[in-house]
């Protein structure tokens, strides 16, 4: 019951903050109180700081070290740079060298986690990883939707990204449950199978086709977004599983009843957002 309640609560908050329903509900009670883009910003900001807090706790920073005092000011500074662009509608998806470098840093952080994990036992490594793993993906998440303050419109790119992530997880789970035989990463995530992965890819692309069919004005092609989500979503899960394994932690936190922490729920989102953002850049270039 607790898990069901936590899932419904989490899903409802995400839906209300990533569609126009949130501001409609609030403004029906108190007219003109909030605009949808502000709700979305609040959601992403909450996710960022809760996720960063969980990451700091999970990685066990030295209480006497200076790094634990620097991590949050650095995250605030990085996120502030993205926030300025968000409120000025400054995400153009042009080939921007600073954005490409930021995306490359995420790749380096993931490779470090799997191939050079000993670097993360030092507090300076923990500091750099935490900033990259939290501030950059959630910063890029601000750039995905389009909005207008004049008529309070807000597009559904992030809502459908969540839909694809949730659906991909479900498709992979049920396909793996009935047909799974070959383990994908038995030491990191023993329940994942290649058959489940293939089922997740196939059905998520089909779902992306229907999203593209009925919502053609969204950024990008959602069949391609579905493919990216189904491929990189499991990687996000493996990244967080490896992080928890490295530091001997079962759950990242307990903020969502029955579901663990923010990082447990958003592991796929954290990796999928930069990938989709890069796709939007490439699509505009091509």
Task: Describe the residue ranges of each PLM region.
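Membrane-embedded alpha-helical bundles of polytopic integral membrane proteins
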Residues: 1-227
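Hydrophobic alpha-helical transmembrane segments of integral membrane proteins
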Residues: 69, 133, 253, 270-271
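Juxtamembrane boundary at the C-terminal end of a transmembrane helix
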Residues: 278-286
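Interfacial loop-to-transmembrane junctions
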Residues: 246-268
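C-terminal transmembrane helix pair
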Residues: 243-244, 269-275
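Hydrophobic transmembrane alpha-helices of multi-pass small-molecule transporters
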Residues: 204-205, 265, 272, 281
């Amino acid at each position: 019951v607790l898990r069901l309640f936590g899932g419904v609560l989490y899903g409802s908050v995400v839906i209300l903050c990533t569609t126009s329903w949130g501001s409609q509900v609030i403004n029906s009670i108190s007219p003109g109180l909030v605009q949808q883009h502000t709700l979305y910003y609040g959601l992403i900001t909450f996710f960022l700081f809760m996720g960063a807090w969980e990451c700091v706790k999970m990685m066990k920073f030295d209480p006497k070290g200076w790094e634990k005092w620097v991590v949050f000011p650095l995250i605030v500074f990085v996120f502030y740079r993205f926030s300025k662009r968000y409120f000025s509608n400054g995400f153009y998806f042009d080939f921007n060298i600073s954005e490409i470098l930021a995306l490359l840093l995420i790749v380096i952080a993931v490779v470090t986690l799997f191939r050079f994990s000993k670097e993360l036992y030092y507090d300076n490594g923990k500091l750099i990883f935490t900033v990259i793993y939290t501030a950059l993906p959630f910063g890029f998440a601000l750039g995905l939707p389009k909005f207008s303050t004049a008529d309070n419109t807000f597009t559904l790119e992030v809502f459908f990204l969540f839909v694809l992530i949730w659906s991909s997880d479900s498709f992979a789970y049920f396909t793996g449950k009935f047909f799974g035989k070959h383990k994908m990463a038995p030491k990191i995530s023993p329940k994942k199978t290649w058959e489940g992965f293939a089922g997740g890819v196939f059905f998520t692309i089909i779902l992306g086709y229907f999203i593209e069919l009925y919502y053609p004005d969204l950024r990008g092609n959602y069949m391609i977004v579905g493919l990216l989500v189904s491929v990189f979503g499991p990687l996000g899960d493996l990244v967080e599983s490896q992080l928890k394994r490295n530091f001997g932690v079962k759950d990242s936190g307990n903020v969502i009843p029955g579901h663990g922490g923010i990082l447990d729920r958003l592991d796929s989102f954290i990796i999928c957002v930069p990938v989709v953002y890069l796709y939007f850049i490439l699509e505009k270039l091509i």
